[in-house]
């Protein structure tokens, strides 16, 4: 659950993770293969704080890679605080609720390329995990993995197919092979 809160004179997003909403076995695969978290013991009692730390770490990586995403502010146990993407009236809409054009498509593909160039794969990219507020922002990054993860290639392929299918439904001509080639281009 994500809430809007006030810090000083600015809005922030406060994301609270609950064990009841996290499926231990399904998220374990995103942590165990990620070398950045290889020294962390993972059991049912520790999974939520590890998942929060993983999202914070991935947000930091995207900030360093200049990929638009909420700026991480801090975390504690099951709580993550980050910059708020939206206005006084409400949060920025998910991409699924935005009028889509080729410029938005280009921003998404460019963001995927920047992530890949910085050895990051979102691993759950879809129209639900991107916001639009003057530009595209990538969100929900706890499952994002480093390129050394044994399933990184599979996750990247799934992201490419999801993105391609979404934009095709909105009349944008896409080709997963060309997307893959562009993302991996040095």
Swiss-Prot record:
The reply on keyword DNA-binding is: no
UniProt xrefs under Gene3D superfamilies: Phosphorylase Kinase, domain 1 (3.30.200.20), Transferase(Phosphotransferase) domain 1 (1.10.510.10)
CDD domains in alphabetical order: RIO1_like (cd05145)
Database matches in Pfam families? RIO1
What transmembrane ranges does the database entry give? none
Cross-referenced SMART domains: RIO
UniProt keyword annotations, A-Z = ATP-binding, Hydrolase, Kinase, Magnesium, Metal-binding, Nucleotide-binding, Serine/threonine-protein kinase, Transferase
User: What is this enzyme's catalytic activity, as reactions?
Assistant: L-seryl-[protein] + ATP = O-phospho-L-seryl-[protein] + ADP + H(+); L-threonyl-[protein] + ATP = O-phospho-L-threonyl-[protein] + ADP + H(+); ATP + H2O = ADP + phosphate + H(+)
Extract the SUPFAM superfamilies matched here.
Protein kinase-like (PK-like) (SSF56112)
The residues that hold Mg(2+) are: 129, 140
Which GO terms label this protein's molecular function in UniProt? ATP binding; hydrolase activity; metal ion binding; protein serine kinase activity; protein serine/threonine kinase activity
Which superkingdom?
A: Archaea
- Any idea of its EC number? 2.7.11.1, 3.6.1.-
Task: Enumerate the active-site residues.
Answer: 124 (proton acceptor), 140 (4-aspartylphosphate intermediate)
Q: Which InterPro entries match?
A: Kinase-like_dom_sf, RIO-type_Ser/Thr_kinase, RIO_dom, RIO_kinase, RIO_kinase_CS, Tyr_kinase_AS
The residues the record assigns to binding ATP are 15
- Function description: Despite the protein kinase domain is proposed to act predominantly as an ATPase.
User: Which family is this protein grouped under?
Assistant: Belongs to the protein kinase superfamily. RIO-type Ser/Thr kinase family.
Record-given protein name: RIO-type serine/threonine-protein kinase Rio1
Q: What is the lineage of its organism?
A: Archaea, Methanobacteriati, Thermoplasmatota, Thermoplasmata, Thermoplasmatales
